[in-house]
């Protein structure tokens, strides 16, 4: 790979140089800070932001630098004491980059592979450390966010305070999760200070959006606080017949009768309209993506409605014990029509034969997690003991139908083609419950912290599938149970360096059965060994982390060709080994920066015929990124101006598990510029203009995953006018 390595070297050098420079600059800043007793007009004061929520995912951050989170241990634990690789996307990063999707939100986090399916506004599909976490790795406020088939909850970035990322197997606290780790999305919560914001946006493809965010005390007498966040969007996309419309509203209330008691209610409703198909036609002769839209603008509506309401309750019983309970009910309904062109017509090669379908899916879930935390000493040992029990109940129902569609005319590929009504062919109903109980002790002695935890889960899954044409019913019932654990040791020096080592496991129950053996699938299991170091520079708001990891996953599910059809088989084993480094800083001089590099080697140890020993498709060895944002001094000629820019490198990878062809490497650039009108006159205080661009140079190359090829999302430019008062 000489060419790819050559292309990668400049960005790797940039990331490593940025990391080294951060240490030097931050150290110099710290030395200057020690010598200064007051700030001058050129400095920018950083505010420590606490995203409250108890075990729901509290994040404490200063600018771009996450300091502590409840994601790593379900207790508010400093990153330096967490014996596992952990990162955060802070509130300030969200403001500076103005992401429009969850994938854009996570684009600069280490080891996270976004864009494996190219342009596709239907789903937020992504990988970490080589493992898909779309269905199993997304949590909301430390509670599992279930997903099934096409029923995947959409996550609005404007409704988030931040994201905490815990990489590697994490079932010791969270139960059914995958090998890659979990992404905990922290919902905006009520603030005690008054917050008022309105914003209008206009961007590429006639994207119109208005949004608002209000928070503060309900009145001056009662300890009750509210927050109301919402947006309305009408937008086209780069594909004809694929809109990106959304209506979103999220109310929240907090009641704090005393310092030891808090109840927060979190709600949300959204309606999103996009396309049932968003892919490009793949030419069977070459196996590569063309520029022809594979769908049908006249039969391509996908409407998703989702709602959730839940609470977080915390009560301090005494100086030792704190009780917490988090719960949520969520529902999702998606109705979609789709059309897909798959190959040339036998009689007329200018036509492409197509198939069409329709589906109606409904997902309802209830999740509750009850915890008791105790802090006490035994001799010289300090303990933070956590005991908990959680329960998840979900029901998934799907109606699916397949039919015929008029062929696609390649001479006029965007012309709509009428499709006759399609009847549903099958109905699937799945009921699943999971019960887990866990225990964890964080034991501190001098500079040492030992974290030991274990969890036992029981899972029951019942699946009924009905052929509506014959009214025949197939029922599958299975029960799984599994123990998961984690042990980690951290040593924290008095100058901010914290090396650690850990071992953790995860399990994931699988629905269905092996058609070769007629036996239910076993749970997918994984284990990880990790060693790393974290460095919080003294007297400087800079955090640098690095980690080496080895993950083994067994009993994975794969599709294997048997005759003329594909069946699911379970005889797989994957191994992921790699290295990650990340640096985040927000300095007093107005500069904030995040940089990361990840090397990941993911191989198929056991799998379908022709794949053993190969690399997993669309899993690049190298991923690197750098993002910087600078606010010019208030007393200089550029007062009020902020500029930002970033680069995201994705190394080459294979386009299928057979490793017969490759995806090329690529670098995508992003940019931002903002202006605070208060620099002109104080009467304009609160009025700000910001313009953000992603994929600035409109690089739209093919990216292939599991043998099917897509295209990168093209350039988008969005201007925002925001007013706070």
What role is predicted for each listed range?
Residues 309-332, 355-466:
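Face-selective signature of the C-terminal outer-membrane beta-barrel domain
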Residues 447, 550, 570-656, 700:
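Gram-negative outer-membrane beta-barrel transporters
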Residues 6, 384-385, 529, 617-725:
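Conserved C-terminal beta-signal and adjacent last beta-strands/turns
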Residues 314-316, 320-328, 332-340, 523-586, ...:
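Membrane-embedded beta-barrel scaffold of Gram-negative outer-membrane proteins
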Residues 158-161, 167, 172-251, 257-261, ...:
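Outer-membrane beta-barrel translocator/receptor signature
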């Amino acid at each position: 790979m000489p060419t790819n390595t050559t292309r990668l070297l400049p960005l790797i050098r940039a990331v490593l140089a940025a990391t080294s420079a951060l240490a030097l600059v931050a150290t110099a800043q710290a030395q200057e800070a020690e010598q200064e007793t007051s700030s001058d007009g050129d400095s920018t004061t950083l505010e420590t932001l606490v995203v409250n929520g108890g075990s729901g995912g509290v994040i404490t951050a200063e600018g771009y630098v996450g300091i502590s989170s409840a994601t790593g241990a379900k207790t508010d634990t400093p990153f330096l004491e967490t014996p596992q690789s952990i990162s955060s996307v802070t509130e300030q990063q969200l403001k500076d980059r103005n992401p429009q999707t969850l994938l854009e939100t996570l684009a600069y986090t280490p080891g996270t592979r976004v864009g494996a399916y190219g342009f596709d506004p239907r789903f937020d599909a992504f990988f970490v450390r080589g493992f898909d976490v779309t269905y199993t790795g997304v949590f909301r406020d430390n509670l599992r966010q279930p997903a099934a088939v096409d029923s995947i909850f959409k996550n609005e970035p404007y409704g988030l305070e931040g994201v905490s990322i815990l990489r590697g197997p994490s079932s010791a606290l969270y139960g059914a999760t995958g090998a890659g780790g979990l992404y905990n999305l922290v919902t905006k919560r009520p603030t005690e200070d008054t917050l008022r914001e309105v914003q209008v946006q206009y961007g590429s493809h006639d994207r119109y959006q208005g949004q608002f965010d209000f928070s503060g005390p309900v009145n001056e007498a009662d300890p009750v606080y509210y927050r109301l966040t919402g947006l309305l969007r009408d937008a086209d996309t780069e594909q004809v017949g694929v809109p990106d419309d959304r209506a979103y509203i999220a109310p929240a209330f907090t009641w704090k009768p005393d310092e030891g008691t808090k109840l927060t209610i979190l709600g949300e409703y959204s309606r999103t309209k996009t396309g049932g198909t968003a892919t490009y036609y793949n030419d069977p002769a070459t196996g590569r993506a063309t520029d022809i839209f594979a769908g049908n603008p006249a039969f391509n509506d996908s409407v998703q409605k989702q709602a959730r309401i839940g609470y977080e309750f915390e009560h301090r019983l005494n100086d030792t014990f704190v009780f917490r309970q988090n719960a949520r009910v969520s529902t999702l309904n998606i109705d979609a029509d789709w059309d897909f062109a798959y190959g040339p017509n036998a009689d007329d090669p200018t036509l492409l034969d197509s198939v069409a379908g329709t589906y109606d899916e409904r997902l309802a879930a209830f999740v509750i997690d009850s915890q008791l935390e105790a802090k006490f000493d035994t001799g010289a040992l300090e303990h933070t003991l956590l005991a908990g029990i959680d329960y998840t109940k979900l029901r998934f129902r799907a109606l699916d139908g397949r039919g015929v569609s008029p062929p696609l005319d390649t001479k006029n590929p965007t012309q709509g083609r009428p499709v006759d009504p399609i009847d549903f062919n099958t109905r699937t109903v799945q009921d699943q419950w999971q019960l887990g109980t866990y225990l964890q002790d964080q034991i501190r002695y001098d500079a040492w912290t030992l974290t030991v935890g274990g969890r036992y889960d029981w899972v029951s899954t019942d699946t009924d599938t009905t052929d509506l044409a014959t009214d025949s019913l197939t029922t599958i019932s299975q029960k799984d149970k599994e123990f998961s654990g984690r042990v980690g040791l951290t040593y924290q020096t008095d100058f901010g360096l914290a090396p650690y080592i850990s071992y953790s496991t995860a399990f994931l129950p699988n629905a269905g059965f092996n058609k070769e053996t007629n036996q239910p699938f076993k749970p997918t299991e994984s284990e990880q060994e990790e060693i790393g170091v974290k460095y919080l520079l003294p007297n400087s708001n800079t955090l640098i982390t690095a980690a080496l990891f080895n993950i083994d996953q067994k009993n994975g599910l794969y599709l294997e060709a048997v005759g003329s059809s594909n069946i699911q088989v379970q005889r797989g084993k994957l191994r992921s080994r790699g290295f990650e480094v990340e640096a985040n800083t927000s300095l007093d001089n107005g500069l904030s920066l995040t940089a990361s590099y990840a090397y990941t080697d993911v191989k198929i140890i056991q799998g379908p015929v022709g794949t053993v020993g190969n690399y997993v498709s669309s899993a690049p060895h190298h991923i690197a990124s750098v993002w910087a944002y600078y606010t010019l001094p208030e007393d200089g000629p550029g007062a009020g101006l902020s500029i930002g820019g970033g680069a995201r490198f994705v190394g080459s990878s294979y386009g299928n598990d057979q490793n017969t062809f490759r995806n090329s490497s690529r670098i995508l650039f992003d940019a931002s510029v903002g202006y605070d009108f208060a620099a002109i006159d104080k009467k304009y205080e609160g009025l700000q203009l910001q313009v953000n661009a992603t994929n600035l140079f409109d690089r739209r190359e093919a990216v292939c995953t599991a043998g099917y090829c897509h295209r990168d999302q093209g350039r988008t430019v969005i201007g925002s006018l925001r007013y706070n008062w």
